[in-house]
């Protein structure tokens, strides 16, 4: 029997044996291991039978239980295997650090703030956009986490929301109330995944009781409403502009807005509009001759 066939029959790869040999020789050079994996063209998957399993206790001691939990749930969908990498767990650790630092940066401004849903429904401008993303994140999280069991995509939505909050520059007290709502939302959504840091932040924010006893928030349907949408405008099939229109606008209203836009006028001026095609909420195509 050829060596290659023997390895395949016993579910052993060249990469596994290379890693095993290095470990037996006492060599733990990560760069060398990565080099060998690149040259061989395969990586060594974790398996007890292959003696290359990561000790969870070591990972917890180095990065904390929350980081390990976050990394495992974020690395891949639950039905798929994944390759444990230092880069991956370090990325999870950095995210939790960023979240922790962000909370502490704004803690003095938001700790004593209280708000009601009805009150925040009246915010305008950037705060309104941020609030919409907060509640879209809640809706997506509940679907991914509770219905689809796609924990990795649920976590990705939380990460995206943190990016949005970091880009938000609150100026007024109402802005800071929206910021608090966003931070509380991230904390509540993280609590089943990273319970220790979530509990700590929940207490830092001045909330009473344990976060573990708090329900996952429900999305506010009013916050999810879109008042204005941006639609692409084509002239004779070629994209010429993107125009904002009311989300509930009828075709005649959209037509008036589009044809009065300077960027569109450039391509239709002096020509006959033969057709105006509006695919509601998605596309406008103006046919001219």
Swiss-Prot record:
Q: Motif span ('KMSKS' region)?
A: 45-49
Q: Which SUPFAM superfamilies match?
A: Anticodon-binding domain of a subclass of class I aminoacyl-tRNA synthetases (SSF47323), Nucleotidylyl transferase (SSF52374)
Name the chemical reaction catalysed here: tRNA(Leu) + L-leucine + ATP = L-leucyl-tRNA(Leu) + AMP + diphosphate
Q: Name one GO molecular function term.
A: leucine-tRNA ligase activity
Q: Which residues form the signal peptide?
A: none
GO CC term, one of those recorded: cytoplasm
Where does the UniProt annotation locate this protein?
Answer: Cytoplasm
Catalytic activity, EC: 6.1.1.4
User: Where do transmembrane segments lie in this chain?
Assistant: none
Record PANTHER family: LEUCINE--TRNA LIGASE, MITOCHONDRIAL, LEUCYL-TRNA SYNTHETASE
Name of the protein in question = Leucine--tRNA ligase subunit beta
Q: Which organism is it from?
A: Aquifex aeolicus (strain VF5)
Q: What is the lineage of its organism?
A: Bacteria, Pseudomonadati, Aquificota, Aquificia, Aquificales
The encoding gene: leuS'
